[in-house]
């Protein structure tokens, strides 16, 4: 193999490696970040691999939430307008016996797979029950 062909092969291999590195997904924010709307949170949950084909919005929203909704009986999503309202919801969730709640900067999700959500959305998992 001549030097030109060898150099071209090395360049192609280097470009391939660079493309792989550039396509890696950035980790989610440690604090879970914020979502501008319940629809944006819903899309993030879907992108994490949890099926929620039909988000049913609560009218009016849950007590402390700016917006809230559910997907069936095992998934509940909510966004909050302030830290105070978010904290009030977490305090209530502790007494209501929720097993685990995913918590971000302005959102919560109750689901059957809190660790998957934490891995994809960031934030923390608050364990409140058995």
Task: Please report, for each region that a protein language model flagged, where it lies by residue.
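C-terminal motif of bacterial Sec signal peptides marking the signal peptidase cleavage site
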Residues: 15-19
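Short, solvent-exposed recognition patches
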Residues: 35-97
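Bacterial signal peptide processing site
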Residues: 21-24
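Extracytosolic low-complexity repeat regions of secreted or lipid-anchored proteins
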Residues: 72-130
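Terminal, regulation- and interaction-focused segments at domain boundaries
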Residues: 26-36
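Bacterial N-terminal signal peptides that target proteins for export
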Residues: 1-10
């Amino acid at each position: 193999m001549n030097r030109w062909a060898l150099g071209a092969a090395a360049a192609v291999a280097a470009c391939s490696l660079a493309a792989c590195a550039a396509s890696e997904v950035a980790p989610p924010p440690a604090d879970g970040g914020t979502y501008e709307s319940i629809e944006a949170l819903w899309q993030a949950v879907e992108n994490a691999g949890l099926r929620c084909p039909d988000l049913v919005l609560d009218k009016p929203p849950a007590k402390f939430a700016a917006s809230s909704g559910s997907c069936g009986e095992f998934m509940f999503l909510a966004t909050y307008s302030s830290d105070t309202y978010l904290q009030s919801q977490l305090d209530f969730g502790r007494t209501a016996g929720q097993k685990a709640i995913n918590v971000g900067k302005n959102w919560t999700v109750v689901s059957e797979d809190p660790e998957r959500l934490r891995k994809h959305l960031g934030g923390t998992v608050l364990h409140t029950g058995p």
